Amino acid sequence: MKQGLKSILPDPVVRFVRNSYDAIRRLPQVPDAYLHPWRRRSRIRIAQYHNLHRGQRCFIIGNGPSLRDTDLSKLRNEFSFGMNRIYLLFPELGFTTTYFASINDLVIEQCAGEIAALPIPKFLAWHSNRHFQRLPDDMAFLYTSYTGPRFAHDMTGRIWEGATVTNVALQLAFYMGFQQVILIGVDHNFTSQGDANKTVVSTGEDPNHFSPAYFGKGFR
C-alpha cells in the first residue's frame, strides 16, 4: 500500500505527507528536546564546537570490513570521528578517535555503559537519553529527526538523521569548521540481506563490519 501510493503520487506530495506526519509525531517530543536540562546543557556544549577546527581536515571512520585492509596507524595524529561500535578497535589501534557519534537506539541501548566510558567527546541522539542515568561532562545529545533540513548549519537545533550516523558525523564535521572531510571504511556493501528498519537478533558472527563481534550472536 505504502509503496503503491509512492509510485502514483508526485514527489512533492509524498515529501509533504511524510514531513507532516513526522511533524505531528514529533510534537510531544518538542518541549523536552529544547527545555530538558540535559538538552539545554547539550546545546551549550555543542555550540562550543562551532568552527573549532576551521580550515583543518578530519577523517570519518566507518565500520566496514575494509578497515581490515587499511593502515589506520596513519590516523594517530589526525582529527577523526568514530561511530557506533568503532571502540572495539581502539585497543588494537592504541589510540581513540577524536570524537564519537551514535544515533541508533538499539546500539545505544545495548552499549550505553561502554559508550559512556569512552574518554572522548560523544554526540548521541536525544531519543536515546533514557538509557543513561546521568549526563557525563563529555556527552552531548543531538535533537535528530527523520525529516528536516537536509544538512544542518546549526547543530544545536533539529537535525536530519539521514538514515545513517555517517550523515550526522558529516554535519558535525562541517559545523566544527573542518574544510576537508575524508571518509574511510564506509563500504556500502552488506553480506546479510533483510528488510529496512526491521529488528533482528544476530545468530552468529557479523560479516558486515570490521569485527565478527561487532553485531555478534545475540545482538539486536
What would you call each of these model-derived segments?
Residues 2-220:
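Metal-ion/cofactor- or nucleotide/acyl-coenzyme-handling active-site neighborhoods
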